[in-house]
Structure formats: C-alpha cells, structure tokens
Amino acid sequence: MSEKTFLVEIGTEELPPKALRSLAESFAANFTAELDNAGLAHGKVEWFAAPRRLALKVANLAESQPDREVEKRGPAIAQAFDAEGKPSKAAEGWARGCGITVDQAERLKTDKGEWLLYRAHVKGESTEALVPNMVATSLAKLPIPKLMRWGASDVHFVRPVHTVTLLLGDNVIPATILGIQSDRVIRGHRFMGEPEFTIDTADQYPQILLERGKVIADYEARKAKIKADAEEAARKIGGNADLSESLLEEVASLVEWPVVLTAKFEEKFLAVPAEALVYTMKGDQKYFPVYDNAGKLLPNFIFVANIESTDPQQIISGNEKVVRPRLADAEFFFNTDRKKRLEDHLPRLQTVLFQQQLGTLRDKTDRIQALAGWIAGQIGADVNHATRAGLLSKCDLMTNMVFEFTDTQGVMGMHYARHDGEAEDVAVALNEQYQPRFAGDDLPSNPVACALAIADKMDTLAGIFGIGQHPKGDKDPFALRRAALGVLRIIVEKNLALDLQTLTEEAVRLYGDKLTNANVVDDVIDFMLGRFRAWYQDEGYTVDTIQAVLARRPTRPADFDARMKAVSHFRTLEEASALAAANKRVSNILAKATEPLNDIVHASVLKEAAEIELARHLVVLRDKLQPYFADGRYQEALIELAALRAPVDEFFENVMVNAEEKDIRINRLTLLSKLRELFLQVADISLLQ
C-alpha cells in the first residue's frame, strides 16, 4: 500500500498564547484518534504551533483504508423461515439491512445450529475522501472555552481563519474547513520574509516556512531558542535570567521569530521590594528578570522581540520607556503605603465583603486571629505571635501596592510588617499564609506561619461548607480543594499534632450562629479525607490501600499518614494476602451473625486445639500491641500481627465456627471479632485485593 506525508495547517489570527500548546496537543491527539478509528496506517504525528497557525504533519500515511472482509450473522434458520419455507419478517429485515435478499444469503453451520450469513468484501475508502471530515471533527473537539464568529459567516473558531492547507504528498486535498477552501498557500511572518507563498509537498514543512516565511513553526524549537538565547544574554551581564516555565511557554506562544534583547531600568527602583518589580516585569510586560549569583535582582531585564530589526536599540529603548512608568508606580505605592502602619488598615477591612452570608474581611480577620492562636497552642508555636499574625493577615489587601499589583498580596504584608518593626516570624507568616499555592509548592517555614496558613484555609472551608456551598463538579470558586490539600500537606509534612475533628469544630465555633448546615463538621472532614484519597493516589499508593485506611476514618492527618505507610509495608510481607483473605472471611462471617456476642472470649468454652492456640496468640498480642497503637507504631504492629497467619489458617481448617451448640458458636464468633478488632486498630485489611 502506498504511503505519503500528510500536512494540515490552519492559518489564523493571533491565537490565545496561554492556550496555544494545549490547542496543538489536543489537535494532534484528536486527529491521531481519528486516524486509528478509521484504520488508516500512519507513522509519527507531529504538531506545530505558532501565534498564527496550528499544524499537523503525519509521516507514512496510507493512501486508503485496507480492504476488509465483513461477516454479519442473521437469524437462526429455525426463525428465518416459516413452516412453508417462506422468509420471516426478521430474515427479510436483516437481509434488507445487508443490501441483499434472503435467497442471496449464505448459511453458517456450527455444532450449535445453522444461521443465515452475509459475507462481503469491502474496499477501503481513500484517505483523500476521509481526511476532510477527520480534520473538521478534530478541530471541533478542541478545548476552546469561548468561540468567535467573524464576518458574515456562521463559522465559529477560537480566532478568525485565513488559510487552510491540506496536502497528501504533493496533492491538495479539496475541502472546505472552517469556511475556507483548502489550498497550498501558506502565510509567513507579518513583517519579515514572504508574506504569502505556496508549498509544493507536505515534506517541505516546516523548513519552507522557516526559510521563506521567517516563522519557526516548531513550538519546542522556538521555546528552546528563547531559553538558550536568554541564558546567554544574562551571562553577558553577569547574571541569571528568571526563566520560569510558565512565562517561557507564554512568550514562545507570542512570537514567530524570537529575537532576545537586553534592557535596563534605573537602579533607584531596586529600593522597591523585588517581588513588586518582578510582578510587573513578568506579569504585565512578559519580561525575564535577571538576578546576580547571590539571588539579588539586577537593574536589567531580558525580553523577546518578534522581529529582527536593523536598529535593535530602538526596540530596547521603547521597552525601557514602557516599563519605567510601571516601576515608578510601584515605587510611589511602596513609599505611600509605608506612611501608615499595617494595622491602620484594619477599619477598612470592614468595608470589603468576604462572602454575603459570612461577613466582611474584618470578620474573617477576627476569626483567623482566634483560630491561629488556638492552633499555635496545639502545635507549640508562639501564641502571641500567631494571634498578631492573624490580626494583620489581610491588612495588606487594603494597600495601594496590592490593589494595583494583586499577586503581591502576602509578600507586601511581609515587607510592610518588617518596616513596622513586627516580629520576624509574624512578618514571614503574612507572606506564607497562602502557601502551598499549588501542587509541589513550598510549605510555610515556621510554626507561626503554619498556624496562620491552616487557620486561613480552615476558616474558608468551615464557612463555605457551613452555608452549603460545596464544590460541585469542576466548579470550586473558593478553591476549597486546594485549601483542604494545603492543610493536610502542612499537618502531615510538618508532623503537627492536630486532629481534623477538633480543628474543624473550633473553626465552626468561631462563626457563631452564621452557619446553616448542621452537618458542617462531618462534611468538612469527609471532604478533607477525600482529598487524602487524591493525594495518596498521586503519590503512587493503590486505591485499596487508601480505602483500607479510610475505612477507619482517622482524623489526625499525621496518624493517617503513618497508617498508610504501615499498610503499604504490610502488603510486601509474605503473609499479607492470606491475612487479608482471612480478614475478609471473618468480616463476612461476622456480618451474617445475628446473635449478640460476648464481651470476652471464655477460655473454658474453647474445645479445639486450633481455637485454643489462636486465643492464646490474641491475648499475647493484645497486651503487647497496645503501646504500639498508642504511639502510632502501626508498621511494627502489623509485622507482629503477621505472625497470626499460621494460627488463623489452622483455625479455619480445623474449627467449625457455626457450631450447633450455642455457647461454643458465640464464643468462636467472639474470638473472630477479637481477631478483627486487632487489625482494625490499624486499618480494614479485608479491603486489600
């Protein structure tokens, strides 16, 4: 079968930079699925993405589907004909669906009977006939939250479309995609190279676009060039560029022909906290800040132009003029804000609503202040400092700097607190109260910061659940999932002695009578335990291990973590599978028992050697393991419990649990309940697969 290279390029207006990669990757994934579903053999599928185009290149694409043999079994002969031998309605309907008459059908004989059979040789469709609809379907499935219409057309897409190139080898595949007739025309850079040219074969892409159009269509190559050139530019001025992955991706999505340039700003602006300067450079201007080897911000920045200029200094000067007013604003706000102490902003918090039913930011501040102090007392942090940090926690939201540069909340609170002479752990806590902000983010660094971060998040969880606004589907406007996971991470990774039960109860108590959900405490805890499930799955733990621990509903996160590690280790033991099966058997037996059990196992009623031996082991282990359970030494406890495999096996092989004599039967059921209770001190081992 003949194979050719296939190319599709959709030429558009500037695509959303933050979505460019996901659009291209989805386009490739969707089209690959279409090819596979159609049975079209193909080689590597490459995607290309630049600000004004999405493209796919498929190597070794078959020119048609393979021919195939089709078999359709019809009704059994007994149902296909009536007593007179005439075809039944079922047989005629089946034959009509196959495009034949009943007389034309073959017969299939098996040892189970005889059926009507249709066989046909189906010729595969050509790739040229299939591809247009496959491309259209792949584009329609792109993750585009908001579509556009343009001109008088009813066509919708993420941005207006100007060209559609569809080539199989050197042939144009005729089609109308997104309202545009396919052709071999490609548009180059807006200001460099050829604005428009034709491509002869699919194999010429993307090299022809690079050479004639001055566009680097390969997203990864463009990104790598920006990174390498920016690193070299930073080295030349004795610094290191802040090349965060997210900004690199965004800049790579903004330019077709990246040219890296270095500019500077006045050193006087370095008196402003670096975070504010970096915020405007990265967030507003898409510049890369530069730091010296000690991590101090330099009065330089690196930016990426989309054109090779004959006078690059003019571009540099233009960017310096653009950024200067923004830095001057930051300087002005910083100097103005420092004329007031942080706590002077407290009254203004009363004017800002946190949530309609839950009050203002001042109300939230009062609750955080009290809760942070309570948490500090539980974990051995400085209660006065935690209380002070809680009081000041939201004051920076009222400052000019944070109002203008919203992402500097927290960090500006830290700088202003230091200026006011607050304790260092209080100042740091104001910055770290929002940590962890995302998966893998740093945790608060000191106990006061931990207390404040937990208090802030728990107040939000208690309040929003308390008015019944649980997250639904992918909607989570108050970021409750992130808050819950943040609390759990802090408690587990910092090994804090906090119990979700008492922590949630305290957070709820501080709301007074504002909350309407009577089950708020249980709802919050269940939600947080659900976050544990997601967290440990991400960490590589099996679902049944997580369920075994969740079945015990441990509300102390550090304790939950210890149980998870213990059960995970238990699974590596030779005895694990047998004991898990035995626990499952015990669980089923006890679930069916209808008679009340004894409080203790009566030794005088034990008859069989196997049950006497099992009872002896349980007595020894019960006494031995109590300190293990009390200290959370679950791994050691399960290792000890593994020794029960032999006596448990002997018991089930030689003892009839449901004996006819009632006293013996109840005593044996009680013995099994005591066995199960020991394992349940750690987890429900019966749930392990």
From Swiss-Prot:
Its main location: cytoplasm. It is found in: Cytoplasm. It holds the Pfam family tRNA_synt_2f. GO terms for biological process: arginyl-tRNA aminoacylation; glycyl-tRNA aminoacylation. Belongs to the class-II aminoacyl-tRNA synthetase family. Tetramer of two alpha and two beta subunits. This is Glycine--tRNA ligase beta subunit. It comes from Salmonella arizonae (strain ATCC BAA-731 / CDC346-86 / RSK2980). The lineage of its organism: Bacteria, Pseudomonadati, Pseudomonadota, Gammaproteobacteria, Enterobacterales. The gene is glyS.
